[in-house]
Each structure stands twice: as C-alpha cells, then as structure tokens.
C-alpha cells in the first residue's frame, strides 16, 4: 500500500494547548489542532501564539495536523524581539 500524499497549509498559531499542541487558524479560514513534528522537538524550535507556521495534514483527517515549519519573523534582520537583552551581555564561565 502506497503512502498517501500529505497536504500542506499555512496558518497562524492562535492558542497554545497542553502536550505540545497548538490551535492554528489556516489561511483558508479553518481552525485545526496541530502537534509539533519530531524534528522541531529535537532541535528545540519554540512556537508562540502569533507565529506563522506550515502545517502538514492527511487527506483523510482534516481536523488534525503536524506543525512542520515555523516561519521567521518579518522584522528587518530577523533579529531578537525588542526588549530582549543583547547577546553576550552575561559572561559564561
């Protein structure tokens, strides 16, 4: 049996749920529950409410998805958010 084709959508994280799950508003208007993909957990990529993400879904269940990519911010330079302490401020021993 062949592996089914997965569908990719883009959306916006609206709410963080327990157990590394997120409520995501898709660009098409639907709202789904998505979980973090294993590679994102392994690389400790954090996702916050308001982040743009790419979701992978099975054509058989369009209510759940896997969060596979967090898009970088549109801030110029893609640097840290305002108010964050500059890197290298604290000395490591």
From Swiss-Prot:
Q: Which Pfam families match?
A: eIF-1a
Alphabetized Gene3D superfamilies for the sequence: Nucleic acid-binding proteins
Q: Which UniProt keywords apply?
A: Cytoplasm, Initiation factor, Protein biosynthesis, RNA-binding, rRNA-binding
Q: List the disulfide bonds.
A: none
Q: Which GO terms describe its molecular function?
A: ribosome binding; rRNA binding; translation initiation factor activity
* Subcellular location per the Swiss-Prot or TrEMBL entry: Cytoplasm
Question: Which InterPro entries does this UniProt record tie to the protein?
Answer: NA-bd_OB-fold, RNA-binding_domain_S1_IF1, TIF_IF1
Query: Ranges for the S1-like domain?
Result: 1-72
GO CC, alphabetical? cytosol
Against PROSITE patterns, the record matches this protein to: S1_IF1_TYPE
Q: Which domain of life is it from?
A: Bacteria
State the residue spans of region: Disordered. Answer: 70-93
Query: What does the similarity note say?
Result: Belongs to the IF-1 family.
Q: What does this protein do?
A: One of the essential components for the initiation of protein synthesis. Stabilizes the binding of IF-2 and IF-3 on the 30S subunit to which N-formylmethionyl-tRNA(fMet) subsequently binds. Helps modulate mRNA selection, yielding the 30S pre-initiation complex (PIC). Upon addition of the 50S ribosomal subunit IF-1, IF-2 and IF-3 are released leaving the mature 70S translation initiation complex.
**NCBIfam families listed in its UniProt record:** infA
Its assembly, as annotated, is:
Component of the 30S ribosomal translation pre-initiation complex which assembles on the 30S ribosome in the order IF-2 and IF-3, IF-1 and N-formylmethionyl-tRNA(fMet); mRNA recruitment can occur at any time during PIC assembly.
Q: What is this protein called?
A: Translation initiation factor IF-1
Q: Which organism is the protein's source?
A: Rhodopseudomonas palustris (strain BisB18)
